């Protein structure tokens, strides 16, 4: 060992050493690590290290094959030595801690930050679209040494350190360096994927906050809250063909039928069945005290094996997942997010979720995520009061808090906060290949007085209640999504009359390409919950939606929100005895799938679950042993098949040219009839809905073209549990004008039924019609 003689006097003051020892130095690189230092006329380097648990330390220079003892300076755990070399290569530290000896690389020897000044500039502007590749924890190599680079935005912090198993959760050991714009950064050599970590943030009042990483790619399973180092670039994707096709698609011309799912309550596995990872190794059980005894969550990989074939068989085009970003409380359904960049660990690893999405794409199923940029919870390890100040939220509770939900509101006027959220939306498309987002609670973002009484909100700069900053943010997000990912979906859950929600940003719209039609949903559920006799007085509930159907690009959704909190499940809302309940539901769904607009159904509705949705349970799968439930499931399957194979039902969903009434005025019989037309085609369908239990043996409607109209769908079919009334495969027109049309059909209308008829185009179609069972 050489270099054992200490420097005659250190260049450091006691104050500098104490700042390091007390974790008060904002740039530890100014003190720790290697520094050029001439000693007795010879060029060299002074190397300093603060090692809180070490009794002895030495510097190992592998290139020189030499070792230099370090000596305490002003503090028993602050060590220093001098190395007589003009050029110093990366060195190691030999540390003696009691009876244990370790050799490590010095984090403060690595001075090549991952973040560039340009990265920081873009972030400060709010325009770094891939900031998730810079902030957070990223496995990388510096100076040919593998490790993890950490970076976090905490501008009001006095000091920030990294905590983890690798340093005994001691914030003194890995103190981060402050960069411009309040970003803190440090590379920890030899750290690997899977390490748990947090940030220890100290403010100027001396308060210490332990926070999970806002940009962390993985978190521990709750109730633990640490982030986990993850590498999202290791998975090998197999969906290139899907992504290429999506890029060239025009979503509004496509059939979009969405199955809305909460992964934790769709189906459970027996707790005796051991879940495994990609290599077949057993996974530790996820603690869920509120699940039924003997049950556990399915993993992402198990869901790929069970959910995807189920959805594929039913004919849905997309799966929409209730939020899978990390959240601490199961009962929030995922809508109170703490880890915006982390797929929840309840069901497996990031690679497991990638596998799930990949399998969906390989089976022709798109994936939509519920995204929650409107608010976030107050959990101490999350974004709230992140650096000891209101960093992500507004300081004034009149702007920064949703009291009804007990959550905080993002400050959309702050560039870095907008960047955090906008990049997060792009992140899910980029890293997880998702196909769309549904933005939750858009109305709560757009209105400053949302669920607030007078005096509980602050007007905008013009004295109005519109949240101008939030609207601008949504325009920015949607513009970026469609710029980077053509063919993607961005869907708004917006419950007010805010104009042009689904119009392009270049004409002043918010830029979504679809909006949930909340008005249609409320009108339909009100209407179908009535005794059918009273429906004649409420025909407007059925017809009103067409008046505004083309003012936005609408999606018709019967979602999770309608089957909780005492509202009953969908089948339970229907009046009458069991037969009528199922017939009503089939009629409702038939009208829904023939009405203009894309479609969304929540899980369990497809087979008539009686119980309300329970996030702690799973679906009532045992009901499928009974014929009415089997029939309803078959009905939904056939309805999806009809919808996806009939361009007239989807290609002009957002255009008046795709719809025309035949008759919407037959209030007395509660019957409506209309035509759906295909894009740039003469093909059309005739739809007739009878909303009462009263059948009609002879009901005449006008049609525009003479010929044989084949009955291609009848919700009263015996296979669905209906009475099997119908039109024996179809009807020829009569030269009898009706409803201002030159020809008409004399139809048999079954009770509580949706009928769909198609003009036969040739002898083959006529033959098919003749062989139809109805």
UniProtKB/Swiss-Prot annotation:
GO terms for biological process: glycogen biosynthetic process. GO terms for cellular component: cytosol. It comes from the Bacteria. The keyword ATP-binding does not apply. Keywords: Carbohydrate metabolism, Glycogen biosynthesis, Glycogen metabolism, Glycosyltransferase, Transferase. Disulfide bonds: none annotated. Pathway: Glycan biosynthesis; glycogen biosynthesis. The keyword Glycosyltransferase applies. Belongs to the glycosyl hydrolase 13 family. GlgB subfamily. This is 1,4-alpha-glucan branching enzyme GlgB.
């Amino acid at each position: 060992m050489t270099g054992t003689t200490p420097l005659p006097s250190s260049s450091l003051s006691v104050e500098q050493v104490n700042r390091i020892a007390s974790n008060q130095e904002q740039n530890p690189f100014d003190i720790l690590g290697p520094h050029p230092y001439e000693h007795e006329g010879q060029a060299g380097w002074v190397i300093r290290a603060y090692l809180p648990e070490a009794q002895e330390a030495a510097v190992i220079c592998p290139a020189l094959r030499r070792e230099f003892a370090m000596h305490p300076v002003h503090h028993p755990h602050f060590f220093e030595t001098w190395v007589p070399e003009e050029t110093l290569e990366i060195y190691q530290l030999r540390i003696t801690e009691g009876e244990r000896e370790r050799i490590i690389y010095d984090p403060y020897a690595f001075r090549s930050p991952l973040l560039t000044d340009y990265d920081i500039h873009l972030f400060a502007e709010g325009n770094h679209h891939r900031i998730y590749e810079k902030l957070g924890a990223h496995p990388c190599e510096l100076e040919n040494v593998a490790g993890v680079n950490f970076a976090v935005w905490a501008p009001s912090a006095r000091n920030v350190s990294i905590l983890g198993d690798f340093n005994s959760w001691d914030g003194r050991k890995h103190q981060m360096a402050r960069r411009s714009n309040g970003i803190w950064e440090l590379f920890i050599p030899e750290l690997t994927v899977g390490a748990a970590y947090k940030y220890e943030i100290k403010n100027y009042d001396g308060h210490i906050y332990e926070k999970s990483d806002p940009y962390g790619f993985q978190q521990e399973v709750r109730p633990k809250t640490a982030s986990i180092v993850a590498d999202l670039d290791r998975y090998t994707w197999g969906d290139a063909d899907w992504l290429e096709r999506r890029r060239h698609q025009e979503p509004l011309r496509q059939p979009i039928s969405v199955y809305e799912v909460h992964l934790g309550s769709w189906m459970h596995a027996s707790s005796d069945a051991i879940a495994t990872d990609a290599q077949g190794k057993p996974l530790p059980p996820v603690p869920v005290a509120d699940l039924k005894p003997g049950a556990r969550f399915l993993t992402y990989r198990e869901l790929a094996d069970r959910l995807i074939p189920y959805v594929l068989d039913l004919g849905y085009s997309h799966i929409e997942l209730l939020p899978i970003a990390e959240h601490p409380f199961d009962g929030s359904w995922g809508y109170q997010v703490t880890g915006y960049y982390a797929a929840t660990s309840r069901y497996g690893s990031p690679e497991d979720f990638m596998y799930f999405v990949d399998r969906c794409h390989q089976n022709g199923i798109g994936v939509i995520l519920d995204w929650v940029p409107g608010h976030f919870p107050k959990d101490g390890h999350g974004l709230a009061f992140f650096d000891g100040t209101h960093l992500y939220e507004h300081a004034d509770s009149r702007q920064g808090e949703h009291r009804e939900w007990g959550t905080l509101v993002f400050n959309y006027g702050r560039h870095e906060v907008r960047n955090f959220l906008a990049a997060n939306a792009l992140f899910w498309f980029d890293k997880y290949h998702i196909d769309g987002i549904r933005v939750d609670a858009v109305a709560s973002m757009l209105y400053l007085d949302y669920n607030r009484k007078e005096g509980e909100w602050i007007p905008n700069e013009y004295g109005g209640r519109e949240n101008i900053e939030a609207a601008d943010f949504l325009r920015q997000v949607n513009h970026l999504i469609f710029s980077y990912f053509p063919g993607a979906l961005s869907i708004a859950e917006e419950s007010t009359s805010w104009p042009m929600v689904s119009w392009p940003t270049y004409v002043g719209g918010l830029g979504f390409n679809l909006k949930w039609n909340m008005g249609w949903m409320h009108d339909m559920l009100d209407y179908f919950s009535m005794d059918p006799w009273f429906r004649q007085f409420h025909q407007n509930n059925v017809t009103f939606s067409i008046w505004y159907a083309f003012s936005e690009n609408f999606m018709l959704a019967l979602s999770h929100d309608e089957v909780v909190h005492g509202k009953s499940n969908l089948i339970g809302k229907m009046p009458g005895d069991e037969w009528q309940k199922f017939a009503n539901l089939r009629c409702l769904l038939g009208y829904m799938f023939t009405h203009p607009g894309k479609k969304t159904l929540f899980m369990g509705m497809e087979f008539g679950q009686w119980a309300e949705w329970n996030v702690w349970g799973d679906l009532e799968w045992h009901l499928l042993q009974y014929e009415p439930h089997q029939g309803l499931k078959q009905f939904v399957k056939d309805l999806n098949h009809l919808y996806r194979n009939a361009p007239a039902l989807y290609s002009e969903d957002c255009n008046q040219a795709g719809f025309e009434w035949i008759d919407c005025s037959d209030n007395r019989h509660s019957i409506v009839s209309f035509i759906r037309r295909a894009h740039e085609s003469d093909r059309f369908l005739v739809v007739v809905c009878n909303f009462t239990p009263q059948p009609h043996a002879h009901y005449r409607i006008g049609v525009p073209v003479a010929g044989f109209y084949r009955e291609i769908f009848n919700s009263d079919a015996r296979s669905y549990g209906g009475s099997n009334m119908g039109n024996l495969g179809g009807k020829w027109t009569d030269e009898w004008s009706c409803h201002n049309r030159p020809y008409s059909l004399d139809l048999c209308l079954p009770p509580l039924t949706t009928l769909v008829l198609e003009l036969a185009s040739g002898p083959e179609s006529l033959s098919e019609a003749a062989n139809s069972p109805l």
